[in-house]
Amino acid sequence: MGGGCPYSIYLNTEEKNISFNGLDIEVINHSKNMKWSDRLIDSLKKIKTKYVILMLDDFLINADVKQDKIDQCINWMDQNPDVAVFSFASSLWKDIDDKRYEGFVLRPTEGEYRFNLQAALWRKKQLIKILRKGESPWQTEHMGTFRSRVLYSNKKFYASEKNVPMIIPYEFGGAIHQGKWTEGTPELLRKNNISMVDYSIRGFDPKSTEEWSKLRLDEVPVIKKKSIKIKIGEYLVALGIIKARN
């Protein structure tokens, strides 16, 4: 997995610092009191590029990145301003094969998790527009999906085709599933000379990566039904019409 990274890397974190030979890393520190989405918005505004590849901290790359495919996606976005994102992970739901971009399918406007935090190439301005302050990652995916439907139905959200090699290869859903380590993570960390991890604190997810990636649609965790009053309130907050109560 050699070859380095041709891009600048921005690490959005609270107080850690890091450097690595051969990599252009800029650490953006934030207060622990800041909400997750506030930190992400602030970090994105400090990045000067037109596009960003968003990756969460448990997306541990386990094979060579297909750089030529990323370059191709950038070219497509340059030529097509209606494209908001190319997600490098496939969805678990039915998508639209519009045959516009090889290896990608269109997420339906009403699709579950149309907005999500899987590894993806984003048009930075569009990503910032969808985000709102005061949200956790899970709230961001839920509310961001709603905002993408209502405010940005004219924008195209693409995901990788199912059953094709990932452009940025990592375990489906990341190294942590529902707060627990995946079974394959220790071996991957050992291969990369990372050994000081106490796996007993989190424990291990009983589901394998293969099980997660083959879940039937009715088994995928979705937002539970709530009263209409609560639901309307959440959506008004998502759109920024009212403020959430502390």
Label every PLM stretch briefly.
Residues 1-31, 46:
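N-terminal anchoring/stem segment of glycosyltransferases
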Residues 41-51:
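Active-site nucleotide-sugar/metal-binding loop of Leloir-type enzymes
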Residues 50-60:
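Short beta-strand-to-loop acidic/aromatic patch adjacent to the donor-nucleotide binding site
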Residues 64-94:
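Conserved donor-nucleotide/metal-binding helix-loop-beta segment in metal-dependent transferases, i.e.
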Residues 115-180:
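Catalytic core and acceptor-binding pocket of nucleotide-sugar-dependent glycosyltransferases
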Residues 158-206, 210-211:
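PAPS-dependent sulfotransferase catalytic core
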Residues 195-246:
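Membrane-proximal basic amphipathic "stem/tether" segments
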